[in-house]
């Protein structure tokens, strides 16, 4: 037997039932179904994914540094009390590159978020600004994922050569540029 409630039309925006439902949703201070709120939540989610990729790249470099140290930097002995300076420099180079990646990760995690200013929403065109932020976030995630993929392919037995470091720095520069563009977009909202 069919349910008679299935045949009823949904209430329109002029309906009292509709207004009560909207008031209940907004009465808690946040409406999950509005596009701007979804875009704000997506912004945080996307930046956390980009940060995970950067953290994975830095962790891989720290792992490679440990393997390199175990292989080439033996414990001191009477014959060799000091480590080989060339291998020591190469091991420190892993750490320096990982530190540069983590600096970008820190900037990404600490980046400004789009405010929820109810007074100026209509005057600023907030939805368009959130869409522009979404495009910047896509660039951030893609760049971070490419960087993590590049670092994942590094061999474990050798240091970072100049060509690979230049590619890593190129990805870091792209991420820095995307973070700067993101900051410029959000500066409009302040």
Predicted feature locations:
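Leu/Val/Ala/Ile-rich N-terminal alpha-helices, chiefly Sec-type signal peptides and the beginnings
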Residues: 1-72, 76
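Charged linear interaction tracts used for macromolecular binding and regulation
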Residues: 59-160
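Amphipathic, non-membrane alpha-helical segments in soluble helical-bundle scaffolds
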Residues: 13, 17-20, 43-47, 51-55, ...
């Amino acid at each position: 037997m069919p349910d008679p409630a299935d045949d009823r039309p949904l209430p329109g925006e002029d309906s009292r039932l509709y207004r009560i439902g909207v008031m209940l949703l907004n009465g808690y201070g946040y409406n999950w179904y509005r596009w701007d709120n979804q875009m704000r939540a997506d912004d945080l989610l996307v930046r956390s994914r980009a940060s995970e990729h950067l953290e994975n790249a830095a962790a891989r470099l720290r792992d490679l540094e440990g393997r390199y140290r175990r292989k080439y930097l033996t414990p001191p002995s009477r014959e060799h009390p000091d480590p080989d300076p060339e291998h020591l420099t190469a091991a420190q180079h892993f750490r320096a590159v990982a530190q540069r990646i983590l600096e970008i990760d820190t900037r990404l995690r600490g980046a400004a978020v789009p405010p929820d200013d109810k007074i100026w929403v209509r005057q600023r065109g907030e939805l368009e600004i959130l869409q522009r932020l979404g495009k910047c976030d896509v660039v951030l995630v893609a760049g971070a994922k490419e960087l993590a993929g590049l670092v994942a392919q590094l061999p474990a037995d050798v240091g970072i050569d100049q060509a690979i470091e230049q590619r890593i720095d190129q990805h870091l520069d792209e991420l820095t540029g995307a973070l700067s563009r993101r900051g410029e977009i959000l500066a409009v909202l302040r």
